[in-house]
Amino acid sequence: MLDVNVFDELRIGLATADDIRRWSKGEVKKPETINYRTLKPEKDGLFCERIFGPTRDWECACGKYKRVRYKGIICERCGVEVTKSKVRRERMGHIELAAPVTHIWYFKGVPSRLGYLLDLAPKDLDLIIYFGANIITSVDEEARHSDQTTLEAEMLLEKKDVEADAESDIAERAEKLEEDLAELEAAGAKADARRKVQAAADKEMQHIRERAQREIDRLDEVWQTFIKLAPKQMIRDEKLYDELIDRYEDYFTGGMGAESIEALIQNFDLDAEAEELRDIINNGKGQKKMRALKRLKVVAAFQRSGNDPAGMVLNAIPVIPPELRPMVQLDGGRFATSDLNDLYRRVINRNNRLKRMIELGAPEIIVNNEKRMLQESVDALFDNGRRGRPVTGPGNRPLKSLSDLLKGKQGRFRQNLLGKRVDYSGRSVIIVGPQLRLHECGLPKLMALELFKPFVMKRLVENEYAQNIKSAKRMVERQRPEVWDVLEEAISEHPVMLNRAPTLHRLGIQAFEPVLVEGKAIQLHPLACEAFNADFDGDQMAVHLPLSAEAQAEARVLMLASNNILSPASGKPLAMPRLDMVTGLYYLTLEKSSEEFGGQGAYQPADENGPEKGVYSSLAEAIMAYDRGVLGLQAPVRIRLNHLRPPAEVEAEQFPDGWNQGETWLAHTTLGRVMFNEILPWNYPYLEGVMVRKGGGSDKIMLGDVVNDLAAKYPMITVAQTMDKMKDAGFYWSTRSGVTIAMSDVLVLPNKEEMLDRYEESARQIEVKYNRGKLTGRERYDRLVELWKDATDEVGQAVEDLYPDDNPIPMIVKSGAAGNMRQIWTLAGMKGMVVNSKGDYITRPIKTSFREGLTVLEYFNNSHGSRKGLADTALRTADSGYLTRRLVDVAQDVIVRVEDCGTRQGVRVPVAAEVLDATGAVTGYTRHDLIETSVSGRVLAGDATNAAGEVVLAAGTDLTELNIDLLVEAGIKDVKVRSVLTCQTPTGVCAKCYGKSMASGQQVDIGEAVGIVAAQSIGEPGTQLTMRTFHQGGVGGDITGGLPRVQELFEARVPKNCAPIASVEGVIHLEDEGNFYTLTIVPDDGSDNVVYEKLSKRQGLASTRVAMESNAGAFIERTLTEGDRVTVGQRLLRGAADPHDVLEILGRRGVEQHLIDEVQAVYRAQGVAIHDKHIEIIIRQMLRRGTVIESGSTEFLPGSLVDLSEAKLANSEAIGAGGQPAELRSEIMGITKASLATESWLSAASFQETTRVLTDAAINKRSDKLIGLKENVIIGKLIPAGTGISRYRNISIKPTEAARNAAYSIPTYGESIYGDDGFGEFTGASVPLDEAF
């Protein structure tokens, strides 16, 4: 077998008939498969043992040689080599064809490579190949020229003979006519009878003349065709061709079918054709030039690659190994076989029949028909259904050809090469494991035993519980008690990987340390649910076992759940308390007033009745009061603390030099809040507020912000421990909070009817106006929708006011644990407006709440929207998965290759926003809204200087939160940062341009697969949001508008209702022309006016920002009008701009920024944070190539797409050699097109359009350098990312100078040398020798 680690490249080319015969171990001559009586393969058949190898290991077909000792011997009786049966997966055969056939990929593919090479239209090719017309393959012009006068004389002679024959025939007939007339006259016939005879004779003579003329015309046509005869000339008239062959076969050759195509290819001069085509390209224009360009691509491909074009016509076809097209016996004695066997049998049957007919000397028409059938059967074998109706099997099912085995989701690439199944894995339902630590998972004992079976067996033998592996296996299978103890040892510190499908981002697989649990369900840590998007309603997860020490180390260091708290997309924590935990922490940190609580232990200020109460000397004293029932958890108290750090303002006031542990301070707080702060690290500032998951306020603290802050300031291990404590506290206190929901908790509005009656009256007035014709249908619809939305809002607000704070329903919402206020409105107020299947509102609202119950009509109306929601969700989930797949494909080879590419280029990003006072004057600066997603985690490309020109931060500085604050304080509005868009690394990106890894907060490591992380970061929220509509019960935001827009942007499509953009800066002049505007821009530089005609009024003019005269520094948004000024790139109509226009007008940087802004706008509208750098990676891949306009001295073909880094290299070489550089135009490619244009043919073929990619790659003899991840996964090599890159693989360990000196210095023997002898301390007991050493 081939070792994948031996080669560095994989090349694909065209196989010639000699190659096919060289691969083959023998010719398959019969269509038989196996003998149905003996069940042995037939000799010379499709499963022949002589060709493909024995069906049993080390045994020939006849049984003369058995056992491995005869290895390599070829049996003289049956001719089968004694070897392993595994060779039947590798050995190929071949079929010698009685007539050549063309390869359908090259003839029928788009564009037709054969057609371009021979300059024949696909229609004509089809006629030739399938015996519908003849083609001239060669003409002996010299012989024709030299013999032309002789041949012409012969032809004139023949014409004269025809004329003479006709004349004699006519004379003969005239003579006979005279005789007939004389006879009639003698017989006294009437004039009428004589006239008839005369007319008949005239007609006959006319026929003779016409026949003669036709014969002469025919001879003229034959002669004219012959003297103009040229190679590649098609002759559709069969009689004309036969005549030419009869008369002049010595002067030309021709024919029909693949033989003629083969002859044309053999006579084809590649170099001369390429030269001629280049000449046409340089001097021609229009269609002729375009055709020449397309043809030159194919001709140059053969010229450059050294492929023999004759390989496109086959004289022998390969037969793939029988184990890859198996035949298996079913229970009923029937056989199931691969479709390929049927297709091969058709080829062999037709081939044998053709051979027999040729031997018998059958008429040409029959032989040609048989050749055509052979061509069709080979077409069906290679690509069934590509031409004409597909060959079908039983039940009219099209048979799967060789192409179908490669194509699509079930094809070889995606099913078997990229989606292999693995052993040491299991799968089970998940349940919650609240007792687990963040890095642990509960593994069912039986599953663990099966997964760790080899490890357990080894330890059983090592610990002398079993004598050998066989008995150890028996012990494991019988589940002896000792086995469980050994299993505990085997699993300790051996992480397992858990995966939940769909794995939308890298946190869909994480490593955990297993803990054995009873039952059959896997227990998952509650905080890990968010990353896996898991819930416990029947979800299943798969377990995988990393086996080698390296795999275990990687799982522990890189994949352990406690090391993966942050999202790789935004750097925000994913392991966040949710649901019950949030309720518990909200309850714990809630504060209620003393009156409300009414306990003795609550804080009460001093008054005339006595000193202040509720002041505690320590936390222990407060807990004691709580345990005795004197103090409430949420009651306000004052506690003296010395083990928790005070809040920042208290620390600044009381401890100017900084607080040290042990120093006391007085906290105005509640007991619950102190308990919560005990969870946090001791030196974390005290948090005084109520903990919520979302919807912050004055005294509310967002749990996300806390976890974010912890992740930024503390090591991951501390964060993980804190999260675990939060989880425990959350569950503990949510149990004690007694938050439950009963029907009695859903309060109903007492005055809802009166409220709605008012709106009902207004709705009636609208209907009356509509019926009287005062309103159009659209106005009526808009007014009713507006009216009932107001009604829903009013009722909803009243419901909110009705609920007391301690009601569990608003408590769940206010804490951010689940749901939103709108759902409470639906539950207790009214559902409001619902949509129909088209997405329009139904103008009758649902006035009842779920508590009251819907009427039949309301339920029916509601079902439209619900059904639409579910259908949309299902469709968009598939869309989103496909988007992710395309993104991964386009970015999979973007890996961090080097530390620093050394570029000084970068992009400008906003840092600070001005703070204006009422007069519009700048009073200070604040952080820009987009800092988190654009600036954070980058490296400065240039010095950041303030207004005075002083350097605040030097180039190369990492932009941490601290550094960003420095920039904001210095009033620096924007800075130039390093970006992957400007990275100069030829393949992949450099660490400096990428910046920090969002998942770790540290500089990205070399070898990190940042392309795939980027694709996952963009694709995962798309899917999450589409799915989340189902969880929300149809309420709230939805990505409907968003996902198609993201696809449109990444595919670089022209948007629907595309808006034109200004190509120059100037003043606009508008002309109204009915349904359209004509807009003219008068440029500032005095150049020619730019006119935009037929701008749709319906689409509407775009809005523009105009400075307010009354308020300096303030702007208003309004529609463009006459005399407005527009800048370059500004949109003129409402709608999205075409990225291709943006590239043309604003250049590369303009389109980059446009795409980032547009994609981010979609995600921000959904509340999803994705760092710009991920989108930049995809955009970099979209803008990687350019079109060659002038090739200069380089080898590029004009009109071809070239990688810009390659072009740069070729240009510098051309200039160095004193030549002309190539001229290129930047192109923006959609992600699908960019994926297919990749250098790696393996990656492109496994993505889409497999046959087209392989056809193209074979003609160009493409070599895959195995740079990306996908191609290495396909061939089974270690991927070139992470620890798989060469700089980590090829490490040789050498001692340092100091170590070398120490090793070769003269040793001195101290007492320690006589210490440990391996026998341990003296005990008096004998020690077994094998234990001692």
Swiss-Prot record:
Entry note: cofactor: Binds 1 Mg(2+) ion per subunit. Binds 2 Zn(2+) ions per subunit.
Record keyword DNA-binding present: no
Segment forming the signal sequence: none
Cofactor list: Mg(2+); Zn(2+)
Binding-site positions, Zn(2+) 1: C60, C62, C75, C78
Enzyme class: transferase
GO BP terms, alphabetized: DNA-templated transcription
Cited function: DNA-dependent RNA polymerase catalyzes the transcription of DNA into RNA using the four ribonucleoside triphosphates as substrates.
Family according to the record: Belongs to the RNA polymerase beta' chain family.
UniProt name for this protein: DNA-directed RNA polymerase subunit beta'
The organism of origin for this protein: Corynebacterium glutamicum (strain ATCC 13032 / DSM 20300 / JCM 1318 / BCRC 11384 / CCUG 27702 / LMG 3730 / NBRC 12168 / NCIMB 10025 / NRRL B-2784 / 534)
Lineage: Bacteria, Bacillati, Actinomycetota, Actinomycetes, Mycobacteriales
